């Protein structure tokens, strides 16, 4: 497949997104007005939720997103750990190293510079409303405002995917 064929295929696939964007716009209008800009662009000063008769759908989505985050990532208890893919390689030294690496990963994720909590909270809201989030993880090497390299988590708007 050459570049021209790949470009043609991408244009065809993205051209079929129109109906999906309209569906997401309708869902967002009713359940997630903060993200209701799939098919329109907001101007400063626009009212974004003035069409809602009640805030109940928005509150239900927010509550569901909060519950998803609480169940999947309880901040008070460790919710993940590293293990070897081959159980036979799990000896005392490897367990100690994996425990250390798990702690290092947890500290990197919950470092305020990583924005992990914010990205996951946005992702939980996207999942509650649309059934899927778009989350990326990056390694930032040269940020003069931070001390050394760190992870950066971002939740992207589905319209941009």
Regions found by a protein language model. Give the residues of each.
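Extended, helix-rich architectural segments
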Residues: 1-161
């Amino acid at each position: 497949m050459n570049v021209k064929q790949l470009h043609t295929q991408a244009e065809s696939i993205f051209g079929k997104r129109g109906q999906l964007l309209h569906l997401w716009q309708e869902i967002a209008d009713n359940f997630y007005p903060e993200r209701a800009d799939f098919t329109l662009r907001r101007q400063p000063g626009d009212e974004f939720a003035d069409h809602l008769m009640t805030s109940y759908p928005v509150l239900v989505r927010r509550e569901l997103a909060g519950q998803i985050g609480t169940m999947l990532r309880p901040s008070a208890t460790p919710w993940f750990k590293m293990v070897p893919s081959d159980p036979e390689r799990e000896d005392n030294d490897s367990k100690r190293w994996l425990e250390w690496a798990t702690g290092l990963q947890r500290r990197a994720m919950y470092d305020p510079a990583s924005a992990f909590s914010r990205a996951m909270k946005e992702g939980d809201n996207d999942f509650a409303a649309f059934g899927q989030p778009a989350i990326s993880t990056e390694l930032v090497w040269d940020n003069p405002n931070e001390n050394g390299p760190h992870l950066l988590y971002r939740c992207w708007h589905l319209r941009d995917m």
